[in-house]
């Protein structure tokens, strides 16, 4: 009744493989948040050491001054190995430079980040998908690794790069020029 047609299955397999490669070799940010476009990629270097390349994916109408009112994706492509615990602790330090929060919030957020952020190697990517009033979803190499559903955390965490008090003003300025 049904005849197997090897060429049909072979061509279907090729199509599936092509889709898989396209999704996994390219940036997943447009798929994570439809309608976003990348701003120019920026490199963060500290004391001459390259840390990561940062890319901000935004929708038309995005305003840096009111970044917490817009959905967007922040993508960090690491250029060196770092421990997840170091990323988490440094994030808390940087968040303090952007805004105030209590010791309880710090403890809760640090615990959440320690649970979420993995150790990274050169070539790994961390993405933060932000949706206003909801919080932040984190991905590691395009796989969801956790969520922190606290709008204040999201505002301060993403403010590390986007707030006017950022300690990486060159990244922010370059993205402002790209808007």
For each predicted feature, which ranges?
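Short regulatory "switch" loops immediately downstream of catalytic or recognition motifs
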Residues: 1-2, 21
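Bacterial N-terminal signal peptides
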Residues: 12-24
């Amino acid at each position: 009744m049904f005849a197997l047609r090897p060429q049909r299955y072979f061509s279907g397999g090729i199509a599936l493989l092509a889709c898989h490669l396209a999704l996994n070799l390219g940036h997943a940010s447009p798929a994570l948040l439809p309608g976003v476009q990348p701003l120019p990629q920026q490199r963060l270097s500290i004391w001459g050491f390259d840390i990561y390349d940062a890319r901000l994916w935004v929708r038309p109408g995005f305003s840096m001054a009111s970044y917490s009112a817009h959905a967007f994706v922040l993508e960090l492509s690491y250029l060196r190995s770092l421990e997840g615990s170091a990323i988490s602790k440094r994030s808390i330090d940087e968040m303090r430079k952007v805004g105030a929060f209590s010791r309880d919030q710090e403890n809760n957020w640090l615990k959440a980040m320690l649970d979420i952020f993995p150790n990274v190697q050169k070539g790994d990517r961390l993405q933060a998908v932000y949706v206003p009033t909801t919080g932040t979803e984190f991905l590691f190499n395009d796989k969801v690794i956790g969520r922190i559903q606290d709008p204040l955390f999201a505002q301060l965490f993403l403010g590390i790069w986007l707030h006017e008090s950022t300690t990486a003003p060159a990244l922010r300025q370059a993205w402002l020029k790209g808007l």
